[in-house]
Structure formats: C-alpha cells, structure tokens
Amino acid sequence: MNVGFDAKRLFFNGSGLGNYARSTVRLLAEYAPDNRYTLFTPREGNCCGFEVPDNAGIVTPQGIRALSGSLWRSYAMGRAIRLSGVDIFHGLSNELPADIGRTRARSVV
C-alpha cells in the first residue's frame, strides 16, 4: 500500500503537529515496512533532524507550481497524489487538498 502524507508540518514544525507527523511516519515505516510512504511538502526542510525512512519518498511541486507552496497544497497537490499512486492520504494538519476528490486515494484527517 502507498500511504501519502501532507508533510509540511513534518519538515517545518518543531513541536505539536510536527512531532505528531514525524512520530506517525517513523513508527509506520518501522512497524509496517512493506508499505510505501510518500511525503508531500511544498519544499524540503530538515526540522529536528528527521531522517526520511528507506521506504519513504518526498514529493515537492515542480515548475510553475513551485512558486506558491500554499496554493500547491490547497489546489494542486491532488494531481501529485494521483500521479504518485497513493492509496490512502492523511492530512496530518487536519486539512485535505481541495482537489483530493480527483484522486482514487481514500483520505483521512
């Protein structure tokens, strides 16, 4: 299964939602290693020394979409989710992209 995460908070928040996101991804990667974990973020960061697990990958906006990370997260991340083959998507910060309905992925906040 390919599990996708809105990982902005994972990479840029040192506490609260960032801790929740890092713990969730780290523990799932460790205890469910057969899954693939896809981390969607407007840009890569390195908050708190988080190391991306071997069974995880990072997706960032490309081209013109990279100009506005917040617009990408809200209105274009669904396309990236679809192209990445995500089966289930978790909006870690209690948000889902507006275009999540255009994907085949199940979603949860």
Language-model regions, residue ranges each:
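Carbohydrate transferase catalytic cores enriched for Leloir-type hexosyltransferases
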Residues: 1-109
